[in-house]
């Protein structure tokens, strides 16, 4: 029965094995798509490497960012992923839809790399200015929000679109960190404007933040990753954020359930099912309780734990960590798979995934701090 302490060194080995000449690969498996350096995966992996003072992951982050910078689009856009194929570099900015979140992940990664003393600021400033400018252009109407196409962020085969909580919060966080690191007050001011919109217009009656605002409607689904990123972007103890984090705990952890990526689950009798069923690249993964459709992702479980710690919710954090150990104890053959199904807690998706290995490392350190 594996514990966090037993899995932590194995997770580290996965993360070290994922390093390549062009950066940190998404997973240590012989599958072409997961051999790519994805911007979001590389940054998420690298951020924890910086926190742990791990030179291998820190260098992997730097190499990943260099690769992405070298293939930045003419308008400032950042690739979703870059991969080596038959000795040639293949660059993708998104296939089903453009991956807008890559731009903010890149800005955040560069800022953190410089903050931790792993690079001088000079090599990154021009590319970051271009990246931030393209987001300003995408804002288009001066609302401080960016309209995200369906599948335009990490949930790339899910029905999230519009003025998504996740992408606005990620942009705000990246601007805040970049503004502080590169001494750019205008970036910090912009971050504050975005956060003001989120805390004033996205809060629902139940205490959660809306997953997205769209013309004429509000997407009221619970977006765990969106709440986690918002928690990182806001000051510790921000009342609306604290309330939302507690509501998530009350609705899941206190009922003996780890929080899925999105709730509620979309079932075949739901009006949205046909759209979800047809929205995929390599086959439909979003069966009920699977993948984005109610799947439990270790990386977002870990970031939720970080959010609880950041905002002073220690009792909720300890309950989460205890539940995490119980769930892991039931998986003797755990191999850092992509997600757990929220109905049976079966493992699903790609094994030896850096997202998952990073989540385990974060949970391990939070438990032992």
Regions found by a protein language model. Give the residues of each.
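Composition- and surface-driven signal marking solvent-exposed, interaction-prone regions
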Residues: 61, 243-246, 314-323, 339
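Short helix-adjacent coil turns
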Residues: 119, 183-186, 311-313
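C-terminal hydrophobic structural anchor segments
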Residues: 297, 301-331
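Catalytic cores of carbohydrate-active enzymes
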Residues: 5-21, 34, 75-83, 143-149, ...
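Solvent-exposed loop and edge beta-strand segments that line ligand/cofactor-binding
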Residues: 25-44, 51-52, 56-58, 88-104, ...
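Aromatic-rich carbohydrate-recognition surfaces in CAZymes
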Residues: 35-142, 168, 241, 298-305, ...
